[in-house]
Amino acid sequence: MNLINLILYFILFWIVFDFIRKNRRISFNDPPSPWALPIIGHLHKLSLNPHRSLTELAKVYGGVYSLHIGDSKTVVITDVSAFKDVTIKQFKNFANRPQPKSIRVITNFKGLAFADYDQWQKTRKLVSSALTKTKIKTFNNLIEKQTENLIESMNEFSNKNELFHPRKYLTKYSLNIILSMLFSKEIGKNESINKGTMERLTIPFNEAFKKVGKVDDFLWFLSPFFYFSNKQYKKYIFDIYYFMEEIYDQHLLDLDYNEPKDLLDQLIIASQGREKETVILVGMDFLLAGSDTQKATQEWFCLYLINNPDVQKKAYQELISVVGKDCKFVTSNHIENCPYFISIIKEVFRIRSPGPLGLPRISIDDTYLSNGMFIPKGTQILLNIFGMGNLLVSEPDQFKPERWINYKNQQQQKQQQQQQQVNNKNSIDSSESSNLEFFDDLEKVSNPFSLGPRNCVGMAIAKSSIYSVCSNILLNFELSSINNQIIDDNEVFGVSINPKEFSIKLTKR
């Protein structure tokens, strides 16, 4: 037998073995799964928008099903009860993260987003302490200042009758909030959006986002073919790290323990200056994830207002009924009195959830979900946030903020009925939960920031900045497209899902 035949026999054996391994059942309670191919598993079933592919598979295989993404055994959750099992009820068993190579380069698994449970506990405690000691009023002031700067820039476009290109300006807005909050730095009002700090951050960010989750994360033998792209990717990540390190070192020199000026000062004090790498990586988490999530949601808000002029008109009328026609700036105190506006933001989160698959998790031990399905140790878990907001609501592709108003009214009526049942000593149905039970239960099926202890730590800040910029854009400008054409609302998948770039015609109100 010559060497070539030996290699061919080995490859054939490997293919057959891998096919059997990927398709064998561990127990009678395994989640359902389509047939997996050897080597690639179910990668062929994923499109350029994997959240949509996974949602289509959920229509066939149900709210909990399994796939092999390359060699990674994965369970996809598009079920309310199972979602709660993973994020809350069995949180500790699903608290770890998978460790793909692309993420190792970014965080070394020491930051906040991708650290395993033990490291995450320490880091979360550190960040929570720093956030608690930083006054909420300070955050609100930072957000309002950046909102004013953005509106001023938009006014310049409106006065010149020029089309406004929202992406770079909303990116600058989102970055500035995080830079101000973390480091007391900002990209200057008159600083070009194409040069300086903006360029130094956005180019590495954009390149880093393109690499995360690529095929060589799941098929190890392809790594040699990605050698040069991986090398360039590492360079971009190190550029971001060195940018952060410069700021950290300067803060350490200027630190006043009695008067910390920003979140980075608080983190250095809380860590006693002993966790430099962790603190820097936490800052990278905020910059990489937070800025993109906020920017994407703000872009979708503008797009859906343009495509739904009746919604835009109704929201504006509500806003001026609260703030008055002479008001030129909406504050956080105004927002709570604008239920229709809040419903628009919630509908944006539902229909185009910025993180459609959340952050993946890993099961630490063998376990069973509340529906009886078996999850073996080491299984990757994908939380299909997009799918729940799509499959479990009526008319999912329709942008209907009214559904949230109606839902709130229905919930209030339901609570009154339940209270009446209790008063009448009637039994309340406690049948086993199912997706059918939760259909159109919007607060349960729409979870853009996930649930449980490992949800988004910056959720409150993200919501405040989104509410501020969106309400003030609405107050100051009527938004429309070129020639009043409908803007394409098909998404582009990435760390967040973004619309294709578009331009806005701004009409000053």
Swiss-Prot record:
The chain crosses the membrane at residues 1-21. GO terms for molecular function: heme binding; iron ion binding; monooxygenase activity; oxidoreductase activity, acting on paired donors, with incorporation or reduction of molecular oxygen. It is a single-pass membrane protein. One of its GO terms (cellular component) is membrane. It comes from Dictyostelium discoideum. Heme binds at C456. Coiled coil: none annotated. Gene3D superfamilies: Cytochrome P450 (1.10.630.10). Belongs to the cytochrome P450 family. This is Probable cytochrome P450 519B1. It is an enzyme of class 1 (oxidoreductase).
